[in-house]
């Protein structure tokens, strides 16, 4: 077992959930569920196993997990994940078994039934339930509490249910549409989480019956309360509306933010994405900035609905994307956002726990990297990456790692000035020239190693500037990526050649962290620059708006949308006259039409 796996096992949460085992290629080879993740996942790596399980364990090099709030949710999520990923070590349900739902039929005299098919028949569906027995228990409870029609075919006389007070007998007596709708609404509210209100009502009736010494009646109420508690554990993993939706939650701690995106497709949660990064502004603003960037390049693959935490601002995102974006305050959707947020919080805790364990290994990895490259220990590493879209708004960025740790105060951003069009080599030459000619001029210490995001061409461009223009001999290596844009190969030498470095080594992990961090930093800078240019250009078209006023307007209003919705009076407090205010409002509203 590798040391990284040991560290992850040490910080597993004491909660229910699903785990996804991965092999060396990152392929999900097994999905399982657990009442207690910590105990179940650790059990794979302790004690003896049968031949089949031992074969599975021998292939596991990594895992991830999703925390839920109950064993039932874990069961249903496991089914969804298995069907989505088709792990080769899982026993698949070849008959494509589906879970049962409770249905309120769309009839003049509606009734309750159990079904395994969700149809577009204007009926109401609730579930799924882990098995037919649980669904049947819920239906029996509802049958006792709400007197909807019970018989599939209308009899000619009242049945026993009527005499028990469990049916209004529409077969004999007239039951209005209003009365039926009232019962349907009550059942819907009950199944959507309103059963706590029914429990409270039954509790009051139980206490009153006991006070009146009607002990049999009190016992009946008590049994009904127990039935509700036994069968109404909320399930958040599946919806019945088959809508594609993304659920996003976030958590912050120690200057880091973790964002979890749960993908629900056709009503089933099938995948999640976890991203952690240091943040520098306000929590909400940086979160919404990430979400906006997340969907920036996904206009053709958007879900029908996005669910966000309450502290976010969904209106602007909804206007931009043209889809439903909500910050639910209650109900099932709110519970899903809470689950995403809880998973983000746990992921951050795991991250910090692992970071606290890898200090010694990180320092050792720095020493080993120097040995592998045949250079002195690279205590200070500077890494570069470029970003542009078809040559527009080209930028570059540099990050610094000191003894294997990011040194954020040393990060630098560069706007490319001398290169036109999509010339990555030219951009690399310019930024290396600007960076190290300045260090020479200011007599600042040079880095021990330069890391370039790219292959032979980028490395050669950087080395040419350093050696032939500046007379500097600093080791330069490059990190090439594979077709999935993942760190794949370390390049070094003159000419640059691949370096034999195991992908599961801590040295490779260190380089991967450096590449991911510089890429994140430059992409964020590029998007900020591009967004600023796009927003600024709309105001620049208005006579009388210069850079100073533009900054003042954005500082006060925060967005073009709020400027567009403002009144002339709102501009006066900024010292902007009525005439110019009207021009601003009119111009922005014209652009919006």
From Swiss-Prot:
Any one GO biological process: nucleotide-excision repair
This protein's UniProt keywords: Cytoplasm, DNA damage, DNA excision, DNA repair, Excision nuclease, SOS response
Membrane-spanning segments: none
GO molecular function annotations of the record: DNA binding; excinuclease ABC activity
All copies of domain UVR, residue ranges: 196-231
Job description of the protein: The UvrABC repair system catalyzes the recognition and processing of DNA lesions. UvrC both incises the 5' and 3' sides of the lesion. The N-terminal half is responsible for the 3' incision and the C-terminal half is responsible for the 5' incision.
Family: Belongs to the UvrC family.
Assembly behavior: Interacts with UvrB in an incision complex.
Protein name, per record: UvrABC system protein C
Source organism of the structure: Brevibacillus brevis (strain 47 / JCM 6285 / NBRC 100599)
